[in-house]
């Protein structure tokens, strides 16, 4: 039966088709301008940029100039890059400009499509960020596309790991900036830990185009970026607790692979309590007494380390370190760590050096970072399966852009075997058969362990002519993938390794030329070699086409259909022929954890012999249903996490905006005075309730508060004895006394040093309280889930209590700032300034506990200091000569304060 929706779509077309159709008149208008634009000289074409900027300054919008701007960008691309965007690529550029995701298949030129929207939006002068998944792609794309942007008079910058603040600031100041999502997020967090506006590197969040948008905004969405500092070493405790786990039997714990959780049974808990008592680690009677919370946390981590985390699948051991493996790409992530002590538990399990834990100093999720942009767009080959999530969370619609040429790839039905061994034997035979007919083969595996198992089995079968691409061989990744289209080539790759590098039949000509011509001087010999390479690649392409194009063999289905589609999409680029097939077994993770019992019983009834497979469209549909369930569950998890993170995000925005205002303010005296007066009002009215009799006043408590908080020794007892005195009189007298102290300090220190002190005290107090607040919210979030058992909504409870904690933070800020300002003194000799903790940047997945430490180098002192401008000084050591040029040490000059 045809649905009403289906009938409507036949008559009116889908929203996707309408969006594509709606842009075709603009494409026609751009094409109509082509001849006149072509007639312009290079200088005249480049001058169009200033002309467009002038039109925007006069009130025109970007939409008003889209048609001529796209026409100019297309012609400039032809001249600078030798590439002319197709009509469908123009449509892709329009979709990116319209705050949407352009779904474009592999090989359709997404990088070139982005240049159209980038050029148009860069004309506003507010900056455009092009976001990639790794430094290699950011550097590669920036280097190539800078030729185009430079031709048009625009500047291009790139941010990669290891750059200092000056280099980053310069790159962000460019019209177009290429960077990874990690670098952008960490720079935002680091900027909001700076003490001078001039030290910040970013200049706002205007427009971002996210390449591989599904990877960044979905796969990594629930993974916060965290900057942290190390805590005390507790390696002995991890080692002691790790030794308990091998003593347990299967009845002592329960493992849930679906939820990735591990818990102890009653029997296991009793056994652990005895072990902990013997080790002197158990306090009180029960393991679950309040004082044992930390020990329970350590034990749970140790259990997960042994029972949920697999070596060579989730991590590898290298150079005395645990190195995490990205579950989506199979790549190593050196320097990244699991959070909440999980990484230390793995280090104890594998008997490597246990690194100290870390305290969160600042954090943000990608969901909330990218929602800060005024305009956001994305590109990928596979977004449709996550269309609801993109719309729900980011307000981004997914538009499928037609391919320039029809897709000729044949996607075959899955083959299902009973065991791993049978499946791998069938794959090996298929690889050999394909290689014998010169068909290039890309084999996708889900883990290092599986890729190396397949490689070993291939060698044992006598077949050795293949390449293995997994986390262990990360350095050669791009080149190995680029040559996977050579006739007869067999490439085994973990999951989506090499994503972002095109697999061209015959091999990637650009990468071949770059590699083979490296170091050769320009001249006849180099030209001859280049020509020979081009002819060789052309002949190889014809041979690969004749063999049927790239054959993608998948050894397992991923729990996300999108990852499967990405693997399939490596074949059949730009109208090339191709083929894809999934080989499965009942022992695969997806089949074992999520597959239905019905499928298992059906295969048993069929009585399959060893080595036989079943192939039926019904199996594909059953697996797709299982994948949809997993995707829906993961979406719900991400959506729920976002609701909690939004609470923190709202508070983060208030604090970060407040910091910027404080850095920008010329005079903070009024702010400090208001804080002090509000605090005095609160203190007095706490100890002298409104309309209370004098004998009900807490005079002793008020006296203690005045001394302890305000550092004032006032005759409170005498005042209280005065006839007819009221609380308002006390408030005014205390304010007057405090104001006199501060006025005397200002006169003694001088206005310049006082302004420096005020700003430093305010920012340091906010930062310290904010770090404590993050820890408090983490603790609240970890316990609030249990409120559901009492029929209370955990989210509403979290919101209410988080608000109370935030109000307490603001009150503590008033008290902390006032207490420090009332005590601050310039001294002749100050104790050495405590060093800041070494800071690390990393990701943390709240579900798996995964961290991704991408080293954050802390606050880098600018090298060029202007003596007259303290904002350029950065962090100055107390024993350094003062940058102001006075000839005194910093601690005796501008740094001469003891808070």
Curated annotation (Swiss-Prot):
Subcellular localization, as worded in the UniProt entry: Cell inner membrane; Cytoplasm
Residues that hold ATP according to the record: 89, 107-111, 502
Record bears the keyword Repeat: no
A molecular-function term among this protein's GO annotations: protein-exporting ATPase activity
Family annotation (CDD domains): DEXDc_SecA (cd17928), SF2_C_secA (cd18803)
EC number: 7.4.2.8
Major localization class: membrane
Single GO cellular component term: cell envelope Sec protein transport complex
GO terms for biological process, alphabetical: intracellular protein transmembrane transport; protein import; protein targeting; protein transport by the Sec complex
Known cofactor(s): Zn(2+)
Known catalytic reactions: ATP + H2O + cellular proteinSide 1 = ADP + phosphate + cellular proteinSide 2
Keywords: ATP-binding, Cell inner membrane, Cell membrane, Cytoplasm, Membrane, Metal-binding, Nucleotide-binding, Protein transport, Translocase, Translocation, Transport, Zinc
UniProt-annotated binding residues for Zn(2+): 882, 884, 893-894
Cofactor binding mode and count: May bind 1 zinc ion per subunit.
Family per record: Belongs to the SecA family.
Binding partners and assembly: Monomer and homodimer. Part of the essential Sec protein translocation apparatus which comprises SecA, SecYEG and auxiliary proteins SecDF-YajC and YidC.
Protein task: Part of the Sec protein translocase complex. Interacts with the SecYEG preprotein conducting channel. Has a central role in coupling the hydrolysis of ATP to the transfer of proteins into and across the cell membrane, serving both as a receptor for the preprotein-SecB complex and as an ATP-driven molecular motor driving the stepwise translocation of polypeptide chains across the membrane.
Entry-linked NCBIfam families: PRK12904.1, secA
Protein name as it appears in the record: Protein translocase subunit SecA
């Amino acid at each position: 039966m045809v649905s009403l929706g289906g009938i409507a779509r036949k008559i009116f077309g889908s929203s996707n088709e309408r969006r594509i159709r709606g842009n075709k008149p603009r494409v026609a208008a751009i094409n109509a301008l082509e001849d006149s634009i072509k007639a312009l000289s290079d200088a005249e074409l480049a001058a169009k940029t200033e002309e467009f900027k002038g039109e925007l300054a006069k009130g025109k919008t970007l939409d008003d100039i889209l048609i001529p701007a796209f026409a100019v960008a297309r012609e400039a691309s032809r001249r600078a890059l030798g590439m002319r965007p197709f009509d469908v690529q123009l449509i892709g550029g329009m979709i990116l400009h319209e705050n949407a995701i352009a779904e474009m298949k592999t090989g359709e030129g997404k990088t070139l499509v982005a240049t159209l929207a980038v050029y148009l939006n860069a004309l506003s002068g507010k900056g455009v960020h092009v976001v990639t998944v790794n430094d290699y792609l950011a550097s590669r794309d920036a280097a190539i596309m800078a030729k185009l942007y430079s031709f048009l008079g625009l500047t291009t910058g790139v941010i990669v790991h290891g750059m200092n603040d000056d280099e980053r600031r310069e790159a962000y100041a460019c019209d177009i900036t290429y960077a990874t999502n990690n670098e952008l997020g960490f720079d935002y967090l680091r900027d909001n830990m700076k003490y001078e506006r001039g030290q910040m590197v970013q200049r706002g969040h205007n427009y971002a185009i996210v390449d591989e948008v599904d990877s960044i905004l979905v796969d990594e969405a629930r993974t916060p970026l965290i900057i942290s500092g190390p805590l005390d070493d507790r390696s002995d405790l991890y080692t002691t607790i790790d030794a308990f786990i091998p003593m347990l039997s299967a009845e002592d714990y329960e493992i849930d692979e679906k939820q990735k959780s591990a818990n102890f049974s009653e029997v296991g808990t009793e056994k652990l309590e005895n072990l902990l008592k013997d080790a002197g680690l158990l306090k009180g009677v029960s393991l679950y007494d309040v004082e044992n919370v930390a020990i329970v946390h350590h034990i749970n981590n140790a259990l997960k380390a042994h029972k949920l985390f697999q070596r060579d699948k989730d991590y590898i051991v290298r150079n005395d370190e645990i190195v995490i493996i990205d579950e989506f790409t199979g790549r190593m992530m050196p320097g990244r760590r699991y959070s909440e002590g999980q990484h230390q538990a793995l280090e104890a399990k594998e008997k490597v050096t246990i690194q100290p834990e870390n305290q969160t100093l600042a954090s943000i999720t990608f969901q909330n970072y990218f929602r800060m942009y005024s305009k956001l767009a994305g590109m990928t080959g596979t977004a449709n399966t996550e269309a609801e999530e993109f719309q729900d969370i980011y307000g981004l619609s997914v538009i499928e852009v037609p391919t320039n040429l029809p897709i000729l790839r044949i996607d075959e039905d899955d083959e299902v075997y009973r065991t791993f061994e049978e499946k791998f034997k069938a794959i090996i035979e298929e690889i050999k058969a394909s290689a014998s007919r010169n068909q290039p083969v890309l084999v996708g595996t889900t883990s290092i362990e599986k890729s190396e198992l397949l490689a070993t089995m291939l060698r044992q079968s006598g077949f050795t002519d293949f390449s293995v691409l997994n986390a262990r061989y990360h350095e050669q990744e791009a080149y190995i993938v680029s040559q996977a289209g050579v006739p007869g080539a067999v490439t085994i790759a973990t999951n989506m390794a090499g994503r972002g590098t095109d697999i061209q039949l015959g091999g990637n000509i650009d990468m071949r030329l770059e590699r083979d011509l490296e170091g050769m001087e320009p001249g006849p010999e180099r030209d001859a070699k280049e020509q020979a390479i081009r002819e060789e690649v052309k002949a190889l392409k014809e041979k690969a086409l004749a063999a049927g194009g790239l054959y993608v063999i998948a050894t397992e289905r991923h729990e996300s259909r999108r990852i499967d589609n990405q693997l399939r999409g490596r074949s059949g680029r730009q109208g090339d022929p191709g083929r894809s097939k999934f080989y499965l077994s009942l022992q695969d993770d997806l089949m074992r954890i999520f597959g239905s019992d019905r499928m298992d019983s059906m295969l048993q009834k069929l009585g399959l012999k060893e080595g036989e497979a079943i192939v039926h469209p019904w199996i594909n549909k059953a697996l797709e249903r299982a994948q949809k369930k997993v995707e829906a569950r993961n979406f719900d998890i991400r959506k729920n996490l976002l609701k909690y993170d939004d609470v923190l995000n709202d508070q983060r925005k208030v604090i970060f905006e407040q910091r910027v205002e404080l850095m920008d303010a010329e005079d903070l005296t009024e702010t400090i005075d208001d804080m002090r007066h509000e605090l005095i009002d609160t203190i007095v009215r706490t100890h002298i309730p409104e309309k209370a009799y004098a004998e009900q006043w807490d005079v002793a408590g008020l006296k203690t508060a005045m001394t302890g908080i305000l550092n004032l020794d006032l005759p409170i007892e005498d005042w209280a004895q005065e006839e007819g005195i009221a609380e308002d009189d006390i408030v005014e007298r205390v304010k007057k006394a405090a104001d006199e102290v501060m006025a005397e300090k200002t006169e003694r220190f001088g206005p310049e040093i006082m302004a420096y002190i005020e700003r430093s005290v305010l920012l340091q107090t906010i930062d310290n309280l904010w770090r404590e607040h993050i820890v408090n919210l983490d603790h609240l979030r970890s316990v609030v889930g249990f409120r559901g058992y009492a029929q209370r909504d955990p989210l509403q409870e979290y919101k209410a209590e988080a608000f109370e904690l935030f109000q307490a933070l603001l009150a503590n800020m008033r008290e902390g700032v006032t207490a420090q300002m009332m005590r601050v003194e310039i001294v002749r000799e100050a104790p050495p300034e405590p060093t800041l903790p070494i800071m690390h940047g990393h990701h943390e997945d709240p579900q798996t506990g995964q961290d991704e430490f991408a080293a954050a180098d802390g606050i880098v002192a600018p090298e060029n200091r202007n003596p007259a401008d303290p904002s350029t000084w950065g962090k100055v050591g107390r024993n350094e000569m003062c940058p102001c040029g006075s000839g005194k040490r910093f601690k005796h000059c501008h740094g001469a304060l003891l808070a």
